Amino acid sequence: MRLFRIPLLAMGLFFSVSFNLHANTVLADNIHSSAIALRDKKSALSKSTTIDLKELIADPKKYDFFTFRPNLEKLILSGAADTQHISILWYTIPNGSVGLHYHSMTESVYTIDGTQTDAKGVYPTGSLYFNPPESGHKITNSTGFFILAYASPPDFSNTDKIKPYTPVQINTADPDLEKNYTFTYSQAGVKVYDVPLDPKGGMSSKIIKSTSLIRYKYLGNYLLVLKGSCNINGKVFDKDMLVVAKTIETQSYSLSATAGDSCLALGLSF
C-alpha cells in the first residue's frame, strides 16, 4: 500500500492544483467579461445624448434650435445639416410648410407631437414613415415636433429627379402593432420587426419588443422608447425617452425589459 500512497497523493495534488487554476481562470475571465460589459455600457451612453421628449415639447427654447426655414426650427442631434444627420424639427406656427424637395437617400420621420401632411398622407402623433431613395415631397398643414433622420440631406434644387414612390408607414401607437406586423423572435423574450427599407437607401430600422431581463444587443444611431420601460446599457428609460448617438457613428446599445414591465423601442441605424 505504501507503494501507491505517494503517487495517489501526488495525483490528488495535481488535480487540486489543476482545479484551482481552472477556477481562477474562469473567475478571471468572468471579471474581464464584466469589466468589458461595464466599459461598453458606459461608452455607449457617454457617446450618446439623452432627451426627454416631453420636456422638449414643454420648453423647446432650452435647446439649441436654429432656423431651417421660415417658421421652422431644427435641432441637430448628430451629424451636420449638409450631411446625413438626425435632428428634431419644430414647426413654430400652425399649418407650417416646407417647399418641394428631393431625397436621394432614405428619409425617416417620426411624429413626436402634432401632425405632418404631404401628398401621401397625414401623419399624427406616433406615426413613423420612411421615404425611399429618389423620392420627394412638399409639406403642408403641419405643426409640432418630429424626429428626422436623413441618409443624405434634403435637396431643394434637384426636384426634377423625384420619381414615383410609396412610403413605408407604421402607426407605432397601434394597440395591435404586434399583430399587424411580422415580429420574429431574435432571442428568448425578444421579438423584432425589421422595417422593410430599400438597402440602397443607407438606413435600417427595427421595432424591438422585449419582455426579458436578458440584454438584446443593437448596433444603431438611436433608440426611442415607444411603450413601457426599457433598460438601455444599464439605465432605465421610460416612454418618450430618446437615446441618440452624438455622431453618425453607430453605437453598441444593450436593451432589455425592466422588472415588472415590458419594453417597446424603435431603433434606427445608418
Ranges and model annotations:
Residues 1-25:
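Classical Sec-dependent N-terminal signal peptides that target proteins to the secretory pathway
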Residues 24-84, 156-204:
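A short, N-terminal "cap"/entry segment at the start of jelly-roll beta-barrel domains
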Residues 55-125, 132-135:
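Ordered, small/hydrophobic-rich secondary-structure cores
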Residues 88-90, 98-103, 120-121, 140-141, ...:
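Short histidine-centered beta-strand/loop micro-motifs
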Residues 93-95, 126, 134, 200, ...:
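Tight coil/turn sites that cap or link beta-strands
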Residues 93-94, 103-118, 211-233:
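Glycine- and acidic-residue-biased ligand/ion/polar-headgroup-sensing regions
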Residues 117-137, 232-251:
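Short acidic-glycine-tyrosine-enriched beta hairpin
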Residues 143-161, 258-270:
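A short hydrophobic beta-strand segment most commonly corresponding to one strand
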